[in-house]
Curated annotation (Swiss-Prot):
Primary enzyme class: hydrolase
Signal peptide region: 1-20
Residues engaged in binding Ca(2+) 2: 405, 408, 410, 412, 415, 418
Cofactor, how bound (note): Binds 1 zinc ion per subunit.
Family: Belongs to the venom metalloproteinase (M12B) family. P-III subfamily.
Gene3D superfamilies reported in the protein's UniProt record: Collagenase (Catalytic Domain), Disintegrin domain
Residue ranges of every copy of the Disintegrin domain listed in the record: 403-489
Name this polypeptide is given: Zinc metalloproteinase-disintegrin-like 2a
This enzyme's EC code(s): 3.4.24.-
Organism: Crotalus adamanteus (Eastern diamondback rattlesnake)
Disulfide bond as UniProt keyword: yes
Length: 612
């Protein structure tokens, strides 16, 4: 017989209700003081981790007992999670701290099916929970008795200021056609399987130097802020079957590595360039968010590029650290990340079931935890139309560093599936009690899984995006769609106007259209003669500050030149460039530069048969 030791830490409601207090969350006008009672059943003599995988607390809210069930947010960190900061002399310092035994949890209130919770248990309980449709916050009180906590409604937190707070994405709803409802989309079985497949976003968060100053160089406080935000992000994105893993944070402790200014569009552009040139080369990730303490322009508290997920430059966002409350900053980050996932602002016709909507253009005083029906439909449409490839990269089971626990929505070593606790599981393929597939089933999720069985061999699971792409089909032996492949590089495309390169057909004309609009075309050869000079922005190669002119045969592999509409008797050579990103405006690699010739990585026009 296994002996069980029942460990109980007393928690009772303190016989006092405060009228006003200053807490870490701000000025609170009405609160209750409680003492947590934690009940944990442990085998006698078993080693107890610092932070258990599951915990249970009992306390009273408004005089009524509640039971808070908490489960550690497994998968919050990736195996290769790293932290980067900078020494006073500017040296980059990267560490890989152990994060197995972290203290961030999701949870629910017993007997409240609509309840949620996002809690840090690092030093007492700090976070928020939803009870009977209302948002409550809990945090430790700085009293001699360290077990005392304050519990209060979100509505009892005084507003920090009355100024409106908005997203910087501008949009004229009247210019858009009505959103086609998900039920109106004529989805193929392959598309439906793709939508049902779980997605993963590997996230990096960068804290700028103003954040460092705001938190008085306390890197622990900055980390705690970021961890709490990402813990809430994960809770929000369960609605889209998306898991967010924090793969790294970077703190610009010495100075900013870009020019962070209040003009949010400029800062976002500079951050995207830095991410593409620097961050992606040393840290694999899908999306990066800049967390800044600078006061962005006007009422703006965030900005992101719509529909840019997985793009090397544009899969980014900027979020102002605008509130003392972690949840408010987390909701803003969720909003900007949703823009990256193809979701625009909600219009008046959008519905969140009477709750504040995450994609409202203006920040609600009450935290928005739900996506509207419009957001869901736009997100699905974006996924179907764009198929962002990076979010299907499922972390390996062995990459999850903490011990497995069944019921946390994350498949770990020894598990075949994980659909949450039995009360919440809606997956007919998975036994929620054991995290094993039910008898007679082969799979629970994937582009090649349908009704718990592997899709038959030959069933298309990824359509070709262009004539340079290849459609992939299921093997009949796996729930996963095979690796995305494309036609061989150098294959003629677009009626011999280009050659395939990494699944696309780059041409000079298409690049001109992307920069200058639909009326733009490639300029005459005389414009490209400017690249022969090797002066200013007109060249083929650059090494540090030194530039090299193009050889005559390579001039169409340097700076791109276009003309805008009919030119008459004069030619206006149009080009574009950026001081922050020197590759912008250069001819793309793989572009046709002559009959049977393409631009290679050193910007030479070479024979297509020897280029790859």
């Amino acid at each position: 017989m296994i002996q069980v030791l029942l460990v109980t830490i007393c928690l009772a409601v303190f016989p006092y209700q405060g009228s006003s207090i200053i807490l870490g969350s701000g000025n609170v006008n009405d609160y209750e003081v409680v003492y947590p009672r934690k009940v944990t059943a442990l085998p006698k003599g078993a080693a107890q981790p610092k932070y258990e995988d599951t915990m249970q607390y009992e306390f009273k809210v408004n005089g009524e007992p509640v039971v808070l069930h908490l489960e550690k947010n497994k998968g919050l960190f990736s195996e290769d999670y790293s932290e980067t900061h900078y020494s006073p002399d500017g040296r980059e310092i990267t560490t890989y701290p152990p994060v197995e035994d972290h203290c961030y949890y999701h949870g629910r209130i017993q007997n409240d099916a609509d309840s949620t919770a996002s809690i840090s248990a690092c030093n007492g309980l700090k976070g928020h929970f939803k009870l009977q449709g209302e948002m409550y916050l809990i945090e430790p009180l700085e009293l001699s008795d360290s077990e005392a906590h304050a519990v209060f409604k979100y509505e009892n937190v005084e507003k920090e200021d009355e100024a409106p707070k908005m997203c910087g994405v501008t949009q004229n709803w009247e210019s858009y056609e009505p959103i086609k409802k998900a039920s109106q989309l004529n989805l193929t079985p392959e598309q439906q399987r793709y939508l049902n497949t779980k997605k993963y976003i590997e996230l990096v968060i960068v804290a700028d130097n103003v954040m460092v100053k705001k938190y008085t160089s306390n890197s622990t406080a900055i980390r705690t802020r970021i961890y709490a935000c990402v813990n809430t992000l994960n809770l929000i994105y369960r609605a889209f079957n998306i898991h967010i893993a924090l793969v790294g944070i970077e703190i610009w402790s010495n100075k900013d590595l870009i020019n962070v200014i209040s003009a949010s569009n400029v800062t976002l552009d500079l951050f995207g360039n830095w991410r593409r040139r620097v961050l992606l080369r040393r840290k694999r990730h899908d999306n990066a968010q800049l967390l800044t303490a600078i006061d962005l322009d006007g009422p703006t508290i965030g900005l992101a590029r719509v529909g840019s997920m997985c793009d090397p430059k544009c899969s980014t966002g900027i979020v102002q650290d605008h509130s003392k409350l972690d949840v408010m900053v987390a909701v803003t980050m969720a909003h900007e990340l949703a823009h990256n996932l193809g979701i625009n602002h909600d219009g008046n016709q959008c519905n969140c079931g009477g709750n504040p909507c995450i994609m409202s253009a203006t920040l609600n005083f009450e935290p928005a935890y739900r996506f509207s029906d419009c957001s869901r439909d736009e997100h699905w449409r974006y996924l179907i139309d764009n198929r962002p490839p990076c979010i299907l990269n499922k972390p390996l089971i062995t990459d999850i560093v903490s011990p497995p626990v069944c019921g946390n929505y994350f498949v770990e070593v020894g598990e075949e599936c994980d659909c949450g606790l039995p009360a919440h599981c809606q997956n007919p393929c998975c036994n929620a009690a054991t995290c094993k597939l039910r008898p007679g089933t082969q799979c629970e999720d994937g582009e090649c899984c349908e009704q718990c069985q592997f899709t038959s061999a030959g069933t298309e699971c990824r359509a070709a995006k262009s004539e340079c792409d290849i459609a992939e089909s299921c093997t009949g032996q796996s729930a996963d769609c095979p690796t995305d492949n494309f036609q061989r590089n150098g294959r003629p495309c677009l009626n011999n106007n280009g050659y395939c390169y990494n699944g696309k057909c780059p041409t000079l004309d298409h690049q001109c259209i992307s920069f200058f609009g639909s009326s733009a075309t490639v300029a005459p050869d005389v414009c490209f003669n400017l690249n022969l000079k090797g002066e200013g922005n007109f060249y083929c190669r650059r090494e540090n500050t030194r530039i090299f002119p193009c050889a005559p045969q390579d001039k169409k592999c340097g700076r791109l030149f276009c003309v805008l509409g009919p030119t008459g008797n004069t030619i206006s050579c149009q080009s574009t460039y950026s001081q922050s990103d020197l590759d912008i405006g250069m001819v793309d690699l793989g572009t046709k530069c002559g009959d049977g010739r393409v631009c290679n990585s050193t910007r030479q026009c070479v024979d297509v048969n020897t280029a790859y």
